[in-house]
């Protein structure tokens, strides 16, 4: 696992938070990202580690809530 719960990611000018990570089929990490809408509802999406690596290469990561 490379990415931590609470890390922020910007995708298409929208901030997403890593809310969950789990081991998928085989040995692949899967990450659940969540975005809170203004009405309090949440939108979620799941990405595998390869997709997350692509976001890191394009500068999508904002930072960690641990800092």
List each model region and its residues.
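Basic/aromatic-rich interaction segments and small domains that mediate binding to polyanionic partners
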Residues: 12-49
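Intrinsically disordered, low-complexity, charged/polar segments
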Residues: 39-67
